[in-house]
Amino acid sequence: MSKEDVIEMQGTVLESLPNAMFEVELESGQKILAHISGKLRMNFIRILPGDKVTVELSPYDLTRGRITWRAK
């Protein structure tokens, strides 16, 4: 899957789940499961419930995503 195929959306972290998974509510109101991208994991970026994040969604499965940015 190339970078052009992903869908970027904004959302809020609702809950932290095991194995670095998070429940995220998108601005559209949809709830998805998301994991942390490699760069955030390598740099030990902490993500807590209530944080605003940018999520990349695959066009093939819109219920799962990857957190690529945490807003300040």
UniProtKB/Swiss-Prot annotation:
Cellular compartment(s): Cytoplasm
InterPro entries on file: NA-bd_OB-fold, RNA-binding_domain_S1_IF1, S1_domain, TIF_IF1
Keywords: Cytoplasm, Initiation factor, Protein biosynthesis, RNA-binding, rRNA-binding
Domain S1-like stretches: 1-72
Gene3D superfamilies with a match to the protein in the record: Nucleic acid-binding proteins
Entry keyword Calcium: no
Keyword Protein biosynthesis: yes
Listed GO CC annotations: cytosol
One MF annotation (Gene Ontology) recorded for this entry: ribosome binding
SUPFAM superfamilies given in the database record: Nucleic acid-binding proteins
PROSITE patterns xref list: S1_IF1_TYPE
Family in the record: Belongs to the IF-1 family.
Binding partners and assembly: Component of the 30S ribosomal translation pre-initiation complex which assembles on the 30S ribosome in the order IF-2 and IF-3, IF-1 and N-formylmethionyl-tRNA(fMet); mRNA recruitment can occur at any time during PIC assembly.
Protein name, as recorded: Translation initiation factor IF-1
Species the sequence originates in: Clostridium acetobutylicum (strain ATCC 824 / DSM 792 / JCM 1419 / IAM 19013 / LMG 5710 / NBRC 13948 / NRRL B-527 / VKM B-1787 / 2291 / W)
Lineage of the species this protein comes from: Bacteria, Bacillati, Bacillota, Clostridia, Eubacteriales
UniProt gene name: infA
